[in-house]
Design a protein with these regions (language model features):
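Acidic, serine/threonine/proline- and glycine-enriched intrinsically disordered segments
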Residues: 1-117
Length: 117
């Protein structure tokens, strides 16, 4: 099923036939148990690593692996982080790498990146 982009409010707009798959509700349930809220004591890198680990259960294919992370990502947020995501411009994220970049820009700033090295 193809969605009409002009009616979509999601910041994620990946136009690739390989991205057109449904998520099993059990995966959504898993990520909703420990959501990322955007607080100072949370790790953006750790959150993305958890999503990546979960995606390895979904597929061995690298492309589908990254698409799974992008598809499950909105369900993994709560509180301020969910508000930030929902208030992002519709269609502004057009790839899994773009999603990671936007998320890290917000929750894993350059100063924290340098400290992690």
């Amino acid at each position: 099923m193809t969605r009409d982009a002009k009616f979509s409010t999601s910041p994620i707009s990946i136009r690739d036939k390989d991205y057109d798959f449904s998520l099993d509700l059990s995966y959504i349930s898993i990520v909703e148990r420990e959501p990322f809220c955007g607080t100072e004591n949370e790790s953006a890198m750790g959150h993305m690593n958890e999503l990546s680990s979960l995606s390895s259960l979904f597929s061995d294919d690298d492309k589908k692996h990254t698409y799974f992370v992008a598809k499950i990502f909105p369900f993994s947020l709560k509180g301020e982080a969910k508000s930030w995501f929902n208030n992002s411009s519709p269609g502004s994220i057009d790839s899994p790498i773009g999603l990671v970049n936007v998320f890290f820009r917000k929750y894993f700033p350059a100063s924290a990146q340098h400290a992690a090295l």
